[in-house]
Curated annotation (Swiss-Prot):
Specifically methylates the N7 position of a guanine in 16S rRNA. HAMAP family: 16SrRNA_methyltr_G. PANTHER family: S-ADENOSYL-L-METHIONINE-DEPENDENT METHYLTRANSFERASES SUPERFAMILY PROTEIN. InterPro entries: rRNA_ssu_MeTfrase_G, SAM-dependent_MTases_sf. It comes from Brachyspira hyodysenteriae (strain ATCC 49526 / WA1). It is found in: Cytoplasm. CDD domains: AdoMet_MTases (cd02440). This is Ribosomal RNA small subunit methyltransferase G. Its EC number is 2.1.1.-. Disulfide bonds: none annotated.
């Protein structure tokens, strides 16, 4: 797979240098190797994981550019935070994962990739005491559930940034969440994905 061609088309703002490209590829390798014994992804090859998951996370680079002190809820195999932490090595990321085996992988990845800007918490999100500027999540839960977590972890200026798919599903989840329009600002941004319909939902 031509990783360079994928990454070169990701962002107009962020330059992904060779060291960061190598770390992204190494991360994919770590995931697939760990997945042989512990199920952390449905991807079968490094190429599939890179194309379907890492590249997808990086589609929102421009959106995360202005945010810091980020917590990833239900991080799983490290998505979206590990790819983001590789690119934004000056930003702090907290990876929240309640399952021990997955949290063990996140610590392994942190060590192998030399990511001093991430912290792994093996804890239920509702038990977290700290506040965060940015709360994000990908393929973890619906908007209603994540909004409850957001309300517990947010400050007055915090934002909830969610990776989501089809607009119809997003609208359905927003309706089910019964969000008070006068209480929250909701922004939906379409991501430039060639293969599937992808959006970012920003709630503040």
């Amino acid at each position: 797979m031509n990783y360079d061609s994928i990454l070169d088309n990701i962002s107009n703002i962020i330059k992904i240098d060779e060291n960061k490209k190598e770390k992204l590829i190494q991360y994919a390798s770590l995931v697939i190797d760990y997945n042989k014994n512990v199920n952390i992804t449905g991807a079968k090859t490094e190429e599939d994981f890179f194309n379907d998951h890492i590249a997808d996370c990086l589609l929102a680079l421009d959106i995360f550019y202005d945010y810091d002190n980020i917590i990833d809820i239900g991080s799983g195999s490290g998505l979206p935070s590990i790819p983001l932490a590789i690119i934004f090595n000056d930003k702090k990321f907290t990876l929240c994962e309640s399952k021990n085996k997955k949290a063990e992988f996140l610590r392994l990845a942190k060590d192998k990739l030399g990511l001093d800007n991430i912290e792994v918490k093996c804890i239920n999100a509702y038990e977290i005491k700290e506040k965060y500027d940015t709360i994000t999540s990908r393929a973890f839960s619906d908007i209603s559930t994540l909004l409850k977590i957001f309300n517990k972890l947010k400050t007055k200026k915090s934002k909830l940034i969610l990776y989501k798919g089809k607009i119809e599903k997003i609208e359905e989840e927003l309706k089910e969440a019964n969000i008070q329009k006068n209480k929250y600002n909701i922004e939906i941004k379409k991501l430039e994905s060639k293969d599937k319909e992808r959006h970012i939902v920003i709630i503040s």
